[in-house]
């Protein structure tokens, strides 16, 4: 935990629909991030995590993104994904900690009590969207609270990002270790997250997703023609 405090964690992920979806490419992204001074990596899928572990000696936050019919939860949604991540030896496992129903009509509280009991020594990060969720996750034994899902649930859509107000409340009211994640596009926003009380921070798209970055610039050009 001390290794990631006060530093930058870089999210190195590419979905199956993206050109850079390849474990080797993600491992090189992680290597480049380390060269740039990153203190940790957030990665998706066991194959990417294993490839990254061979390339860099940095703490890794691991997730498995998987869609299940009938549920909007897709970040490490079931115990099956948790078990797969535990087998990789990943340092921290991040799970969706929103109040949305999980696959099999399971609520977060039931899900997390089970995995906390099975893996008492594993560090877990709660990907939350609002204060209520963070408070519950901390009470249940989550080690880190992330603002990852703020703005992405139906009840938080339109929330300004990065979620500085949520970071501040988690830090001051709950005394939690807060992972600022989501909506950090420029260094000034990263600074603001830390001033709001972040323990550490994750930045992804603006560093490791060239297709999305390119689209952002192209869309800016389109407004010139309007």
Predicted feature residues:
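Short acidic, glycine/proline-enriched helix-loop-strand junctions
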Residues: 57-58, 106, 119-122, 175-176, ...
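Conserved N-terminal beta1-alpha1 strand-loop-helix module at the mouth
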Residues: 1-87, 118, 124, 132-140, ...
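Active-site-adjacent beta->alpha loops and helix N-cap segments on the catalytic face
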Residues: 19-23, 42-61, 72-78, 97-115, ...
